[in-house]
């Protein structure tokens, strides 16, 4: 489609391409959703066979809604992203219980209780991937996304791409099938 550039394995959505559009994308780390919301998509369905992706995306969305840019940046750009997330979650447990969906809160609460960093994730979890996301390039984009998250419609489908047509009859303006953004 016009307005989309491809190169070096990245997909960059040009201004206005997905504005007020219905979009389907992989849940993955949540960055597809966040970048599409920043670009103005208003109805986004995320799919992933890995249900853990949904929990991670929901945590990121909640952090963006609750934190200012520098605090969010300090967590995601730290040398040990996972430890920072766990620490922040455990220090702000009451707030998270209030803002996260119950199943998401229970998931992260259990992760904190059973926390053993080396057995769950490596210390450099996707740190380099964050530099490629438009919503993190500057404060203006971050706060614009934060504002758009108030109105974007989000749904999840727990399925593989091969089963999408069996799971949903929905039609979309744009469909992204890769988690490389």
Predicted stretch roles:
Residues 49-150:
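Class I S-adenosyl-L-methionine-dependent methyltransferase module
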Residues 152-154:
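Short, conserved active-site loop motifs that form the nucleotide-linked donor/cofactor pocket
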Residues 20-21, 159-176:
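A short acidic, Gly/Pro-enriched loop at the edge of an enzyme's catalytic core
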Residues 38-44, 49-51:
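Conserved S-adenosyl-L-methionine
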Residues 1-19:
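S-adenosyl-L-methionine
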Residues 20-29, 44-45:
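Conserved class I S-adenosyl-L-methionine
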